[in-house]
Amino acid sequence: MFLINLLLMIVPILLAVAFLTLLERKVLGYMQLRKGPNIVGPYGLLQPIADAVKLFTKEPLWPLTSSATMFIIAPILALSLALTMWIPLPMPYPLINMNLGVLFMLAMSSLAVYAILWSGWASNSKYALIGALRAVAQTISYEVTLAIILLSVLLLNGSFTLPTLIITQEHLWLIVPSWPLTMMWFISTLAETNRAPFDLTEGESELVSGFNVEYAAGPFAMFFLAEYANIIMMNIFTTTLFLGAYHNPIMPELYSVNFTLKATALTIMFLWVRASYPRFRYDQLMHLLWKNFLPLTLALCMWHVALPILTAGIPPQT
């Protein structure tokens, strides 16, 4: 039964990822005053399927000098971890209701760094290695603020379980009392998922394509799937943390529709940011985190410790 549930979770995720690639190309197209994909199928709707067929039927090549085992393991690990992170997400019920769901997700996102590092190192290419080192530094740095912001939110929640967050936000979405945290969280998720304007790992002008420069066909597609699965997962996580998950004062009975609309709106914001902003320089990226975000999040964390005590508010599960 568990395997069936697992498949029922994985298949829709992969479908969502496939159509997110189409959505991205369409959004970017219209923002640049062009159509985007419109040949394959009606309005280009079959483009993701054509892309998948093309990628998985190509011959997978790898450099002679690469470490073959690690080279193959890295993309598999990346996709496996990206899919594993969905397990504790309440949609509306999680696959496994973990006591420490948030901690599990943090641990999994930290492990995803290894896949990037291995892929860059095993490729035995200087560009891939530079891209991988940048990705690791960026991901580890931004995880610091993500963890502190999560802690601040969980102080209002009273436990590490995600379903209780939905109960917490029944009357007031957490974006209202902690909007500075929400802004920093959103920017940190952009950096965590290696999206523009923080896509330094894939700086085409300097690093060709970043850590996956030597990958082709299937393994490249796996990295691609992992990246987009992480984007959707992060947006669902943001919805659960700050946007009241399923709650909507106007149409409270449209449970799943509310949730999907919020997550989709956030995803389109990711694409909007990509279309609008130029890439950060590496030192600006680090300066933003260590000099701006970290002091702010620490101060706000202390404020969130005091807030429930000041207002005599008891979290739903203590």
Swiss-Prot record:
Location relative to the cell? Mitochondrion inner membrane
Q: What's a single GO BP term from this record?
A: aerobic respiration
InterPro entries named in the record? NADH_UbQ_OxRdtase_su1/FPO, NADH_UbQ_OxRdtase_su1_CS
| Alphabetized GO MF terms | NADH dehydrogenase (ubiquinone) activity
Q: Which UniProt keywords apply?
A: Electron transport, Membrane, Mitochondrion, Mitochondrion inner membrane, NAD, Respiratory chain, Translocase, Transmembrane, Transmembrane helix, Transport, Ubiquinone
The reply on keyword Lipid metabolism is: no
Transmembrane region(s): 2-22, 70-90, 100-120, 147-167, 171-191, 217-237, 253-273, 294-314
Which membrane topology term applies here?
Multi-pass membrane protein
Task: Return the Pfam families for the record.
Answer: NADHdh (PF00146)
Q: What is its EC number?
A: 7.1.1.2
Q: Which reaction does it catalyse?
A: a ubiquinone + NADH + 5 H(+)(in) = a ubiquinol + NAD(+) + 4 H(+)(out)
GO CC terms: mitochondrial inner membrane
Q: Is Membrane there in the keyword field?
A: yes
- Give the protein family: Belongs to the complex I subunit 1 family.
Instruction: State the function annotated in the UniProt record.
Output: Core subunit of the mitochondrial membrane respiratory chain NADH dehydrogenase (Complex I) that is believed to belong to the minimal assembly required for catalysis. Complex I functions in the transfer of electrons from NADH to the respiratory chain. The immediate electron acceptor for the enzyme is believed to be ubiquinone.
Name of the protein described by the UniProt record: NADH-ubiquinone oxidoreductase chain 1
